[in-house]
């Protein structure tokens, strides 16, 4: 009997720790301590049965984080608000469940030949990037990418920073092939705002984080789109030009498991796809640069300021990493 025990479990038994089941991780006292600290920090409570399940998941994620950080990678991982969840749960709650494919989107962006500045960060140019928001357990990232890009475009054009209503896009933009909490594309959301003749502000159409019925009031619209610039598929250099010369750019990419626990550094992955049919998360490129010979994008996420680098991340630039150059666009505001 004892010979069949996994080595880790056998060690735990010898130390007097309860022996775990064959299908379970043997969670050690250090992992339990970190889990309880994490629960306190994130104000989590569970039933007895769920506690055991979440502890197992947390310990598995904890070990993946440590293994990654002990390896040779360009980014670090850390515990965050997702650390008690499996990637299957995260995909269901936070990423697109309705497949999106922007390959049919007609490009209309005409780019020049450069040269462009070696680095750009719209956050440092002035009040041109709105604060990081939190989409919650709804696959509405596309709405935050959309509002973030339009908020920046309006601020660049007028000097006035607005906070636009993601919930309006969740509730009202279905006719433009968007699906609320199940997914959508910024390019299609920009088209909705253009033809709908506006988007309301966050204060008059507050975010709920769930699908609802459309409550748009045209007289309260404060953000308007004159045109949409759709960047040619896979033309990452055109994205550089657009960010350098005009505006932060919305894009979509494929999130895989290691991205969820991102903390700092330049993210890259060998497990993601690079095609438009696999993208599952939309974000906003607010700048770019290079570090230690690795070019990167500076990207605003919508998982709150406690995730990543105060709500931002860096991702390797120039390789269409995880399909990031497949679905890029930005709005031209009507001001």
UniProtKB/Swiss-Prot annotation:
User: What job does the chain carry out?
Assistant: Important for the overall degradation of proteins in lysosomes.
Check the record and name the SMART domains matching this protein: Inhibitor_I29 (SM00848), Pept_C1 (SM00645)
Enumerate the subcellular locations listed in this protein's record, separating them with semicolons. Lysosome
Which species? Homo sapiens (Human)
Query: Which family is this protein grouped under?
Result: Belongs to the peptidase C1 family.
Q: Name one GO biological process term.
A: positive regulation of gene expression
Kindly list the cysteine pairs connected by disulfide bridges.
102-327, 138-181, 172-214, 272-322
Indicate whether Signal appears among the record's keywords. yes
* Record-linked InterPro entries: Papain-like_cys_pep_sf, Pept_asp_AS, Pept_cys_AS, Pept_his_AS, Peptidase_C1A, Peptidase_C1A_C, Peptidase_C1A_papain-like, Prot_inhib_I29
What is this protein's name? Pro-cathepsin H
Q: What domain of life does the UniProt record list for this protein's source?
A: Eukaryota
PANTHER family linked: CYSTEINE PROTEASE FAMILY C1-RELATED
The glycosylation sites are 101, 230
- Reaction catalyzed: Hydrolysis of proteins, acting as an aminopeptidase (notably, cleaving Arg-|-Xaa bonds) as well as an endopeptidase
Which residues belong to the propeptide? 23-97, 106-115
Q: Pfam family of this protein, just one? A: Peptidase_C1
Key words of the record: Disulfide bond, Glycoprotein, Hydrolase, Lysosome, Protease, Signal, Thiol protease, Zymogen
The GO cellular component terms are: acrosomal vesicle; alveolar lamellar body; axoneme; collagen-containing extracellular matrix; cytoplasmic ribonucleoprotein granule; cytosol; extracellular exosome; extracellular region
Catalytic residues identified in the record:
141, 281, 301
């Amino acid at each position: 009997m004892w010979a069949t025990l996994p080595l880790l479990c056998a060690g735990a038994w010898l130390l007097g720790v309860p022996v775990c089941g064959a299908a379970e991780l043997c969670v050690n006292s250090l992992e339990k301590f970190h889990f309880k600290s994490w629960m306190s920090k994130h104000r989590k409570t569970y039933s007895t049965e769920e506690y055991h399940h979440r502890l197992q998941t947390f310990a598995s994620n904890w070990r993946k984080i440590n293994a990654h950080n002990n390896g040779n990678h360009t980014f670090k991982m850390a515990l965050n608000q997702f650390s008690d969840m499996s990637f299957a749960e995260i995909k269901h709650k936070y990423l697109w469940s309705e497949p999106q494919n922007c390959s049919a989107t007609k490009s209309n962006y005409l780019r020049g030949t450069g040269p462009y500045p070696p680095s750009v960060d719209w956050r440092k140019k002035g009040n041109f990037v709105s604060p990081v928001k939190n989409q919650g357990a709804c696959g509405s990232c596309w709405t935050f990418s959309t509002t973030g890009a339009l908020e920046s475009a309006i601020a660049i054009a007028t000097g006035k920073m607005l906070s636009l209503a993601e919930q309006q896009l969740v509730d009202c933009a279905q006719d433009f092939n968007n699906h609320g909490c199940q997914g959508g594309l910024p390019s299609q959301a920009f088209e909705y705002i253009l033809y709908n003749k506006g988007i309301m502000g966050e204060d008059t159409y507050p975010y709920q984080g769930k699908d609802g019925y459309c409550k748009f009031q045209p007289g309260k619209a404060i953000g308007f789109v004159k045109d949409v610039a759709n960047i040619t598929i896979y033309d990452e250099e055109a994205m550089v030009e657009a960010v350098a010369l005009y505006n932060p750019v919305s894009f979509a990419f494929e999130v895989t498991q290691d991205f969820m626990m991102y903390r700092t550094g330049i993210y890259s992955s060998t497990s993601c796809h690079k095609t438009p049919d696999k993208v599952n998360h939309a974000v906003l490129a607010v700048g770019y640069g290079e570090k230690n010979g690795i070019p990167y994008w500076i990207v605003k996420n919508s998982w709150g300021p406690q995730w990543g680098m105060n709500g931002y991340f860096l991702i390797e630039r120039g390789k269409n990493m995880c399909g990031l150059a497949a679905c890029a666009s930005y709005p031209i505001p009507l001001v």
